[in-house]
Protein backbone atom coordinates (compact mmCIF):
# COMPACT_ATOMS: atom_id res chain seq x y z
CA UNK A 1 0.00 0.00 0.00
CA UNK A 2 2.96 2.32 0.39
CA UNK A 3 4.01 2.03 -3.26
CA UNK A 4 2.67 5.44 -4.24
CA UNK A 5 4.79 7.16 -1.61
CA UNK A 6 7.89 5.10 -2.41
CA UNK A 7 7.54 5.84 -6.12
CA UNK A 8 7.20 9.56 -5.51
CA UNK A 9 10.29 9.70 -3.28
CA UNK A 10 12.33 7.62 -5.72
CA UNK A 11 11.17 9.85 -8.58
CA UNK A 12 12.29 12.88 -6.58
CA UNK A 13 15.71 11.39 -5.83
CA UNK A 14 16.10 10.38 -9.48
CA UNK A 15 15.32 13.87 -10.69
CA UNK A 16 17.67 15.55 -8.20
CA UNK A 17 20.61 13.20 -8.85
CA UNK A 18 20.14 13.40 -12.62
CA UNK A 19 19.88 17.19 -12.44
CA UNK A 20 23.05 17.54 -10.35
CA UNK A 21 25.23 14.86 -11.97
CA UNK A 22 23.74 14.20 -15.39
CA UNK A 23 24.21 10.47 -14.77
CA UNK A 24 21.21 8.23 -15.37
CA UNK A 25 22.95 5.31 -13.69
CA UNK A 26 23.63 7.26 -10.50
CA UNK A 27 20.05 8.52 -10.57
CA UNK A 28 18.76 4.94 -10.75
CA UNK A 29 21.06 3.82 -7.95
CA UNK A 30 19.90 6.72 -5.80
CA UNK A 31 16.25 5.88 -6.48
CA UNK A 32 16.74 2.24 -5.57
CA UNK A 33 18.63 3.11 -2.38
CA UNK A 34 15.95 5.58 -1.27
CA UNK A 35 13.17 3.11 -2.05
CA UNK A 36 15.04 0.31 -0.29
CA UNK A 37 15.48 2.47 2.81
CA UNK A 38 11.78 3.34 2.97
CA UNK A 39 10.85 -0.29 2.43
CA UNK A 40 13.28 -1.29 5.17
CA UNK A 41 11.50 1.12 7.50
CA UNK A 42 8.19 -0.46 6.56
CA UNK A 43 9.73 -3.87 7.20
CA UNK A 44 10.97 -2.82 10.62
CA UNK A 45 7.49 -1.69 11.64
CA UNK A 46 5.74 -4.78 10.27
CA UNK A 47 8.32 -7.53 10.81
CA UNK A 48 10.28 -6.53 13.91
CA UNK A 49 7.59 -4.52 15.70
CA UNK A 50 4.76 -6.64 14.26
CA UNK A 51 2.76 -3.52 13.45
CA UNK A 52 -0.30 -3.36 11.25
CA UNK A 53 0.81 -3.58 7.63
CA UNK A 54 -2.14 -1.65 6.25
CA UNK A 55 -1.58 1.26 8.62
CA UNK A 56 2.16 1.26 7.94
CA UNK A 57 1.64 1.14 4.18
CA UNK A 58 -0.86 3.99 4.18
CA UNK A 59 1.42 6.05 6.42
CA UNK A 60 4.30 5.44 4.02
CA UNK A 61 2.17 6.51 1.07
CA UNK A 62 1.18 9.75 2.80
CA UNK A 63 4.73 10.39 3.99
CA UNK A 64 6.20 9.93 0.51
CA UNK A 65 3.54 12.13 -1.06
CA UNK A 66 4.17 14.92 1.42
CA UNK A 67 7.96 14.64 1.26
CA UNK A 68 8.06 14.77 -2.53
CA UNK A 69 5.71 17.73 -2.55
CA UNK A 70 7.77 19.61 0.04
CA UNK A 71 11.15 19.25 -1.66
CA UNK A 72 9.77 19.05 -5.18
CA UNK A 73 8.55 22.64 -5.08
CA UNK A 74 12.15 23.84 -5.41
CA UNK A 75 12.57 21.79 -8.60
CA UNK A 76 9.66 23.24 -10.57
CA UNK A 77 11.05 24.79 -13.74
CA UNK A 78 14.09 22.52 -13.88
CA UNK A 79 14.47 19.95 -16.66
CA UNK A 80 16.52 16.83 -17.39
CA UNK A 81 17.07 14.80 -20.54
CA UNK A 82 14.96 11.72 -21.20
CA UNK A 83 16.13 8.24 -22.17
CA UNK A 84 15.97 7.50 -25.88
CA UNK A 85 14.01 4.66 -27.40
CA UNK A 86 16.02 1.70 -28.71
CA UNK A 87 14.05 -0.08 -31.45
CA UNK A 88 14.81 -3.75 -32.03
CA UNK A 89 15.18 -4.21 -35.81
CA UNK A 90 12.49 -6.39 -37.31
CA UNK A 91 10.55 -6.96 -34.11
CA UNK A 92 9.43 -3.35 -33.89
CA UNK A 93 7.60 -3.78 -37.21
CA UNK A 94 5.27 -6.50 -35.90
CA UNK A 95 1.70 -5.22 -36.38
CA UNK A 96 -0.12 -3.86 -33.31
CA UNK A 97 2.31 -5.15 -30.67
CA UNK A 98 5.70 -4.48 -32.23
CA UNK A 99 6.09 -0.86 -31.23
CA UNK A 100 4.60 -1.42 -27.77
CA UNK A 101 7.05 -4.19 -26.87
CA UNK A 102 10.13 -3.65 -29.03
CA UNK A 103 10.46 0.10 -29.57
CA UNK A 104 11.14 1.12 -26.00
CA UNK A 105 13.94 2.44 -23.81
CA UNK A 106 16.41 0.12 -22.10
CA UNK A 107 14.56 0.29 -18.78
CA UNK A 108 11.56 -1.41 -20.37
CA UNK A 109 13.80 -4.12 -21.80
CA UNK A 110 15.34 -4.51 -18.35
CA UNK A 111 11.85 -5.12 -16.96
CA UNK A 112 11.43 -8.08 -19.33
CA UNK A 113 14.65 -9.59 -17.99
CA UNK A 114 13.56 -8.97 -14.40
CA UNK A 115 10.18 -10.63 -14.97
CA UNK A 116 11.80 -13.72 -16.49
CA UNK A 117 14.46 -13.84 -13.78
CA UNK A 118 11.98 -13.47 -10.93
CA UNK A 119 9.68 -16.11 -12.43
CA UNK A 120 12.54 -18.58 -12.68
CA UNK A 121 13.82 -17.77 -9.21
CA UNK A 122 10.41 -18.04 -7.52
CA UNK A 123 9.25 -21.26 -9.15
CA UNK A 124 12.42 -23.12 -10.09
CA UNK A 125 14.95 -22.53 -7.31
CA UNK A 126 15.28 -23.48 -3.67
CA UNK A 127 15.47 -19.80 -2.72
CA UNK A 128 12.14 -19.17 -4.45
CA UNK A 129 10.60 -22.10 -2.61
CA UNK A 130 11.73 -20.58 0.68
CA UNK A 131 10.22 -17.21 -0.24
CA UNK A 132 6.87 -18.75 -1.15
CA UNK A 133 6.92 -20.91 1.97
CA UNK A 134 7.49 -17.87 4.17
CA UNK A 135 4.37 -16.35 2.64
CA UNK A 136 2.29 -19.50 2.94
CA UNK A 137 3.47 -21.31 6.08
CA UNK A 138 6.12 -19.36 8.01
CA UNK A 139 5.86 -21.72 10.97
CA UNK A 140 7.02 -24.59 8.77
CA UNK A 141 9.99 -22.56 7.57
CA UNK A 142 10.87 -21.72 11.14
CA UNK A 143 10.69 -25.39 12.12
CA UNK A 144 13.12 -26.18 9.29
CA UNK A 145 15.61 -23.70 10.71
CA UNK A 146 15.02 -20.87 8.25
CA UNK A 147 14.95 -17.28 9.46
CA UNK A 148 11.49 -16.01 8.59
CA UNK A 149 12.36 -12.44 9.55
CA UNK A 150 15.55 -12.41 7.46
CA UNK A 151 13.82 -13.71 4.34
CA UNK A 152 10.95 -11.27 4.74
CA UNK A 153 13.33 -8.35 5.25
CA UNK A 154 15.29 -9.25 2.12
CA UNK A 155 12.11 -9.56 0.07
CA UNK A 156 10.64 -6.31 1.36
CA UNK A 157 13.82 -4.34 0.69
CA UNK A 158 14.43 -5.90 -2.72
CA UNK A 159 10.79 -5.37 -3.67
CA UNK A 160 11.11 -1.77 -2.56
CA UNK A 161 14.16 -1.30 -4.78
CA UNK A 162 12.15 -2.56 -7.75
CA UNK A 163 9.43 -0.06 -6.86
CA UNK A 164 12.19 2.54 -6.90
CA UNK A 165 12.95 1.62 -10.51
CA UNK A 166 9.29 2.21 -11.31
CA UNK A 167 9.38 5.61 -9.66
CA UNK A 168 12.60 6.51 -11.47
CA UNK A 169 10.94 5.81 -14.80
CA UNK A 170 8.77 8.90 -14.55
CA UNK A 171 11.50 11.59 -14.61
CA UNK A 172 13.84 9.51 -16.77
CA UNK A 173 11.36 8.69 -19.53
CA UNK A 174 7.82 9.99 -19.17
CA UNK A 175 8.62 13.60 -18.30
CA UNK A 176 11.72 15.77 -18.45
CA UNK A 177 10.52 18.21 -15.80
CA UNK A 178 9.20 18.04 -12.26
CA UNK A 179 5.54 18.47 -11.35
CA UNK A 180 3.77 17.88 -8.08
CA UNK A 181 2.31 14.37 -7.70
CA UNK A 182 4.38 13.17 -10.65
CA UNK A 183 3.20 9.55 -10.47
CA UNK A 184 -0.47 10.60 -10.54
CA UNK A 185 -1.73 7.60 -8.60
CA UNK A 186 0.17 4.96 -10.57
CA UNK A 187 1.36 3.45 -7.29
CA UNK A 188 -2.21 2.63 -6.33
CA UNK A 189 -2.76 1.02 -9.73
CA UNK A 190 0.38 -1.04 -9.07
CA UNK A 191 -1.18 -2.33 -5.84
CA UNK A 192 -4.23 -3.44 -7.81
CA UNK A 193 -1.95 -4.99 -10.41
CA UNK A 194 -0.45 -7.33 -7.82
CA UNK A 195 -3.91 -8.68 -6.99
CA UNK A 196 -4.87 -8.87 -10.66
CA UNK A 197 -1.70 -10.88 -11.40
CA UNK A 198 -2.29 -13.30 -8.51
CA UNK A 199 1.19 -12.51 -7.16
CA UNK A 200 2.75 -13.96 -10.34
CA UNK A 201 5.48 -11.91 -12.12
CA UNK A 202 4.58 -13.15 -15.60
CA UNK A 203 0.93 -12.23 -15.25
CA UNK A 204 1.97 -8.89 -13.78
CA UNK A 205 3.74 -8.03 -17.05
CA UNK A 206 0.60 -8.55 -19.10
CA UNK A 207 -1.50 -6.77 -16.50
CA UNK A 208 0.87 -3.80 -16.62
CA UNK A 209 0.34 -3.54 -20.37
CA UNK A 210 -3.43 -3.74 -19.87
CA UNK A 211 -3.46 -0.87 -17.40
CA UNK A 212 -0.88 0.97 -19.48
CA UNK A 213 -3.16 0.69 -22.49
CA UNK A 214 -5.96 2.25 -20.45
CA UNK A 215 -3.73 5.19 -19.56
CA UNK A 216 -2.60 5.52 -23.17
CA UNK A 217 -6.22 5.51 -24.35
CA UNK A 218 -6.98 8.35 -21.96
CA UNK A 219 -4.19 10.46 -23.47
CA UNK A 220 -4.85 9.51 -27.11
CA UNK A 221 -8.57 10.21 -26.80
CA UNK A 222 -7.79 13.77 -25.75
CA UNK A 223 -5.33 14.23 -28.62
CA UNK A 224 -7.80 12.81 -31.16
CA UNK A 225 -10.48 15.18 -29.94
CA UNK A 226 -13.03 12.51 -29.09
CA UNK A 227 -16.18 13.99 -27.64
CA UNK A 228 -15.79 12.34 -24.27
CA UNK A 229 -15.87 14.54 -21.15
CA UNK A 230 -12.36 15.08 -19.81
CA UNK A 231 -13.27 13.95 -16.29
CA UNK A 232 -14.44 10.59 -17.65
CA UNK A 233 -11.17 10.13 -19.53
CA UNK A 234 -9.16 11.04 -16.44
CA UNK A 235 -10.94 8.49 -14.29
CA UNK A 236 -10.91 5.73 -16.94
CA UNK A 237 -7.68 3.96 -15.81
CA UNK A 238 -8.86 3.93 -12.20
CA UNK A 239 -12.37 2.84 -13.17
CA UNK A 240 -10.83 -0.03 -15.12
CA UNK A 241 -8.82 -0.95 -12.03
CA UNK A 242 -11.98 -1.18 -9.91
CA UNK A 243 -13.83 -3.21 -12.55
CA UNK A 244 -10.95 -5.66 -13.03
CA UNK A 245 -10.51 -6.20 -9.29
CA UNK A 246 -14.24 -6.75 -8.86
CA UNK A 247 -14.37 -9.32 -11.66
CA UNK A 248 -11.29 -11.14 -10.38
CA UNK A 249 -12.59 -11.24 -6.80
CA UNK A 250 -16.06 -12.49 -7.77
CA UNK A 251 -14.61 -15.13 -10.09
CA UNK A 252 -12.24 -16.44 -7.43
CA UNK A 253 -14.97 -16.60 -4.79
CA UNK A 254 -17.28 -18.54 -7.08
CA UNK A 255 -14.48 -20.95 -7.92
CA UNK A 256 -13.52 -21.25 -4.26
CA UNK A 257 -9.95 -20.27 -5.08
CA UNK A 258 -7.58 -17.78 -3.55
CA UNK A 259 -4.15 -16.95 -4.88
CA UNK A 260 -3.24 -14.67 -2.00
CA UNK A 261 -0.42 -15.99 0.20
CA UNK A 262 -1.98 -17.48 3.33
CA UNK A 263 0.25 -15.51 5.71
CA UNK A 264 0.02 -12.20 3.84
CA UNK A 265 -0.37 -9.31 6.26
CA UNK A 266 0.04 -11.51 9.33
CA UNK A 267 2.85 -10.89 11.83
CA UNK A 268 4.93 -13.96 12.62
CA UNK A 269 5.26 -15.29 16.15
CA UNK A 270 7.50 -18.28 16.66
CA UNK A 271 5.53 -21.39 17.57
CA UNK A 272 2.23 -19.98 16.30
CA UNK A 273 0.43 -21.68 13.41
CA UNK A 274 -1.19 -19.57 10.68
Report each predicted region and the residues it spans.
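Loop-to-transmembrane alpha-helix initiation sites
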Residues: 53-55, 81-86, 104-110, 152, ...
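Helix-loop-helix "hairpin" substructures at the membrane interface of multi-pass membrane proteins
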Residues: 23, 100-178, 201-202, 206
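Membrane-interface helix caps of multi-pass small-molecule transporters
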Residues: 16, 20, 37-40, 44-48, ...
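Transmembrane alpha-helical segments in multi-pass inner-membrane proteins
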Residues: 174-238
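Hydrophobic core segments of alpha-helical transmembrane domains in multi-pass membrane transport
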Residues: 11-15, 65-66, 110-121, 159-167, ...
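Transmembrane helix-bundle core of multi-pass membrane transporters
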Residues: 65-124, 226-233, 258-274
